């Protein structure tokens, strides 16, 4: 992936202001509510029976924060995102057997929650850079499936 200086700056700025404790839980919760088939990977998380249960689930919140912090790896390795996620790709494909299409669904939910949080500051240019970044991460996470 080729990055312009402007894209690097946008990604860096997003992560320097990221509210992990707010955006992470909301993004994962949204994914589990909007795409209920993704819940099958979280059977040990307790109450996932309805939106209220998911949104108030401490395990979902904690994992959402963990997932969002996982994006730090890509931000710190923008010139080599694919290699930065080799171990996580292997884990999700070989041990957890996660459908790689779910990474895209979650990335869309992260984008929606971030856009809502940033408001007018989430310009088309910001969205373009952020979605390019997430697409690179999603591709890297799916690498071991091929």
UniProtKB/Swiss-Prot annotation:
SUPFAM superfamilies xrefs: Globin-like
Annotated positions binding heme b: 63, 92
Superkingdom as given in the UniProt entry: Eukaryota
A biological process term (GO) from this entry: hydrogen peroxide catabolic process
Boundaries of every Globin domain copy: 2-146
Any GO CC annotation of this UniProt entry: hemoglobin complex
One GO molecular-function entry: organic acid binding
Tissues expressing this chain: Red blood cells.
Keywords, sorted A to Z: Heme, Iron, Metal-binding, Oxygen transport, Transport
Family: Belongs to the globin family.
Note: This fish has three hemoglobins: Hb1 (major, about 65-70% of the total), Hb2 (about 5% of the total) and HbC (about 20-25% of the total). Hb1 and Hb2 display a very weak Bohr effect and no Root effect.
General function of this protein: Involved in oxygen transport from gills to the various peripheral tissues.
Oligomer status and interactors: Hb1 is a heterotetramer of two alpha-1 chains and two beta chains. Hb2 is a heterotetramer of two alpha-2 chains and two beta chains.
PANTHER family reported for this sequence: HEMOGLOBIN FAMILY MEMBER (PTHR11442), HEMOGLOBIN SUBUNIT EPSILON (PTHR11442:SF7)
Protein name stated in the entry: Hemoglobin subunit beta-1/2
UniProt source species: Trematomus newnesi
């Amino acid at each position: 992936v080729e990055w312009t200086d402007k894209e690097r700056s946008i990604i860096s700025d997003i992560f320097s202001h990221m509210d992990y404790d707010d955006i992470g839980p909301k993004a994962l919760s949204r994914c589990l509510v909007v795409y209920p088939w993704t819940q099958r990977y979280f059977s040990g998380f307790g109450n996932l029976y309805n939106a209220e249960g998911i949104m108030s689930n401490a395990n979902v919140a904690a994992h959402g924060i963990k997932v969002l912090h996982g994006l730090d790896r890509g931000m710190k390795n923008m010139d080599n995102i694919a290699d930065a996620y080799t171990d996580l790709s292997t884990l999700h494909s070989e041990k957890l057997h996660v459908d790689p299409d779910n990474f895209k669904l979650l990335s869309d939910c992260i984008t929606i929650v971030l856009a809502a949080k940033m408001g007018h500051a989430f310009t088309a240019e910001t969205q373009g850079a952020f979605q390019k970044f997430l697409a690179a991460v999603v591709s890297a996470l799916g690498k071991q499936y091929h």
